[in-house]
Structure formats: C-alpha cells, structure tokens
C-alpha cells in the first residue's frame, strides 16, 4: 500500500491518491470527516483553523459506499485559497504585482525548511518552499489514516492517541487501556488528568503572550495486533523501523520511542524485558509491556506503544535573527500566521500516520485483494498464537 499527496498550503486544494486498500471495505465519508475535524482542534491553534472546514471528497476508488480495490482519490479544499487566488494561482503574474501583494519571502525562519529548501530547488522566493513544507499537508495524511482506521476496525484492531507532555508539563506515564479510551478527547489538550490540562493551557498562553511556541510529546497505542507482523530477517522489514520513519516524517517531529523508550537505558534487563506467559484461551502474552508490543522488529501481540517528540513550531511572533537572501543583511525572520502550540493536533496526525504504517504492514504480511480474505488470514494468525 502507498499514497501520494499534492497541493500547497494556500493553493486550491490538497489531493491524495491511496493505492492498495482491499476491495469490499465499507467506507462512509462522514467517518473520515470526523477524523479530519479532530485534527483542526486543540488548544493553541492559530486563526487558519477558523477559516478552514476540512472535509473530504472521494472522487475515485469507492462506489456506493464500498472500495473497489482500485486507487482511491480524495480531495480537501483549501477555503483560504479565496484570499490567495492570484498569488498562488497557476497563471503568471508580474514582479510588480508580486511585490504589491507583499507575499515574497526572502528572510528564512530558523528551524524551518525555508533556507535549505530554497538552496536545493533554486527558489529566490522562499514562499515556494514553505507552501509545500507547511504542516497543512498533514490534512491529506490524516485522510489517508482515517481510511486505514476503517480498515483496522474491520480487523478488530484499535488505535488511539493522547498528549503526554507539553512544554515540560507531563501527564501520567501510562494508563490502562480502558481508562485511556474512556477519556479520549475529554479536553482540548488531549490529556486525561484535567488538572494537568489547565496547567498546559496556562503554559501555552504564556508562550503565546511572549510571541513564542512550545512543543511536547504524544503517544499512540495500537491494540489487538496479530503476532509476527514485521520481520527480524531484514532491516527494512522491521515494523518498529517502519513506524519510526513514519513518525519522524511528520512536520516538526524530532524523535520517536516505543514502550518505555529512553527510560530503558536507566534500568537493568530484568526490569525491562517482558516475561512470557501462556493462557489456553488467549495463547501467549507478556506479563508487562515495557517494550511497547515489539520484539525483534515484529509485533508480539501486546499493545504497540509509540511515543513521538514534537519540537516547538519554528514560526515565532517575536522572530529570531536571520539573513535576507538577496541583500545578505541581518534581519528578523519572516512572520507567517501560525500556531503557538500544535501538540494536541499533532497527536491526531501521529495517530493517523501510525494507522497507515500498521495497515501497510498488515497488507504486506497478509497479501489480500479483498477484505474478507484479509480477515480470514488474520484470524488464522491469531489462532496460531494459541496453538503454537
């Protein structure tokens, strides 16, 4: 399975083509739009989300509510394009018109793709870089992940996410799955402890008032995975490697870990390895889950726990020092409309990116043309965990 996105932040639309979704999967566009709406929320978001009403239009690959097995094309319209029609349109404009619109960018932002992207593609107007490197593209990725979540639901696989930390303020390390799921989206920073939520809001307000931004840590949990998805045989087939690549490909994500993650470096092996147990009804399982459901590059049947680190957004309303690429003189970096904190929204993006990686790995493990074939193969693998 694979997908390709296209579109600029202030262009007319985002387009995504997904290939490899099995036939006969029931799809309701409102289920996808429900996930799209979640991405737009979260405390600390900027004015852009007051303009956009992200909804998906499916233009191929689905007929009368069911997938065909052919590529699925989805379109997300950028409502803000009405304010950018001339500057972001395909038709040529004069340099005078461009200058009068004051949309040309020559002062790159530290921490963004602006300068290096301009060098790589020889763009003297850095807007050509930031329009594509913008996190607006993640709307298309959430649409893909929403499709994958529908697929996973048909396989009895749950996936959900939360915020673990914002600006150094931390929620509890982990909750049991029932508490986790019962309290999803109970507040606008996506943590479970409401007292922690208010402290995070205060931290976000403080950063906003100072013209600054803050980052944090998000967590994604995948439950009821069949064992043995991935491989120990080759490096490029390891499931944790694939998930890690997906997570750090999200805008502003700088790190990823599984289970207890970097805390494993502080403990002896006897406190980190998960003991193997057996029950005649469910088969093999682990007495703990320090490793986050992954052993030897494969799923072991325990919940897969993924932690992603998001740096603060690089656009600052009190900008850092930069250099004008035309004059080479010192200037403050360009200010673009932005969020002060996008960690709650990023947890939704991360959830959907992981959903794609999980669905892709399942379809590589159990090659299937239609959903019924996939369901049978996964049922057989789950039975193997009991009978082996």
Curated annotation (Swiss-Prot):
InterPro entries: Chorismate_synth, Chorismate_synth_AroC_sf, Chorismate_synthase_CS. FMN binds at residues 132-134, 251-252, 296, 311-315, 337. It catalyses: 5-O-(1-carboxyvinyl)-3-phosphoshikimate = chorismate + phosphate. Reduced FMN (FMNH(2)). Keywords: Amino-acid biosynthesis, Aromatic amino acid biosynthesis, FAD, Flavoprotein, FMN, Lyase, NADP. This reaction introduces a second double bond into the aromatic ring system. Pathway: Metabolic intermediate biosynthesis; chorismate biosynthesis; chorismate from D-erythrose 4-phosphate and phosphoenolpyruvate: step 7/7. GO terms for biological process: amino acid biosynthetic process; aromatic amino acid family biosynthetic process; chorismate biosynthetic process. NADP(+) binds at residues 39, 45. Gene3D superfamilies: Chorismate synthase AroC (3.60.150.10). Homotetramer. Its cofactor is FMNH2. The keyword Cell cycle does not apply. PANTHER family: CHORISMATE SYNTHASE. It is an enzyme of class 4 (lyase). It comes from Staphylococcus aureus (strain JH9). Its EC number is 4.2.3.5. This is Chorismate synthase. GO terms for molecular function: chorismate synthase activity; FMN binding. GO terms for cellular component: cytosol. Belongs to the chorismate synthase family.
């Amino acid at each position: 399975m694979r997908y390709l996105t296209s579109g600029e932040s202030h262009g007319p639309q985002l387009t995504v083509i997904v290939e490899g979704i099995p036939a006969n999967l029931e799809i309701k566009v409102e289920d996808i739009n429900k996930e799209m709406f979640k991405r737009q929320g979260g405390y600390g978001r900027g004015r852009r989300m007051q303009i956009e009403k992200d909804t998906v239009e499916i233009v191929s690959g689905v007929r009368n509510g069911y997938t065909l097995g052919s590529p699925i094309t989805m379109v997300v319209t950028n409502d803000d394009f009405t304010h950018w029609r001339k500057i972001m349109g395909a038709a040529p404009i004069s340099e005078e018109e461009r200058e009068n619109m004051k949309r040309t960018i020559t002062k790159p932002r530290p921490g963004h793709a602006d300068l290096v992207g301009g060098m790589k593609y020889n763009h003297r107007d850095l807007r050509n870089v930031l329009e594509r490197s913008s996190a607006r593209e993640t709307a298309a990725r959430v649409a893909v992940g929403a499709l994958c979540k529908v697929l996973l639901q048909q396989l009895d696989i749950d996936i959900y996410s939360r915020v673990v930390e914002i600006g150094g303020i931390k929620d509890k390390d982990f909750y049991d799955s029932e508490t986790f799921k019962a309290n999803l989206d109970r507040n606008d920073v996506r943590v479970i402890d409401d007292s922690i939520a208010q402290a995070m809001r205060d931290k976000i307000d403080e950063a906003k008032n100072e013209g600054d931004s803050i980052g944090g840590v998000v967590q994604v949990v995948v439950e009821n995975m069949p064992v043995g998805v991935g491989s120990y045989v080759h490096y490029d087939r390891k499931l944790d490697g694939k998930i890690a690549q997906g997570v750090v490909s999200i805008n502003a994500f700088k790190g990823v870990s599984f289970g207890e993650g970097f805390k494993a470096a502080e403990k002896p092996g006897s406190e980190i390895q998960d003991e193997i147990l057996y029950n005649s009804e469910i088969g093999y399982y682990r007495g703990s889950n320090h490793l986050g459901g992954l052993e030897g590059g494969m799923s072991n049947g325990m919940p897969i726990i993924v932690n992603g680190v998001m740096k603060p957004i690089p656009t600052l309303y009190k900008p850092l020092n930069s250099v004008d690429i035309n004059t080479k003189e010192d200037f403050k970096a360009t200010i673009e409309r932005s969020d002060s904190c996008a960690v709650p929204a990023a947890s939704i993006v991360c959830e959907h990116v992981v959903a794609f990686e999980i669905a892709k790995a399942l379809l590589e493990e159990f090659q299937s043309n239609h959903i019924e074939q996939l369901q049978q193969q996964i049922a057989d693998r789950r039975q193997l965990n009991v009978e082996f």
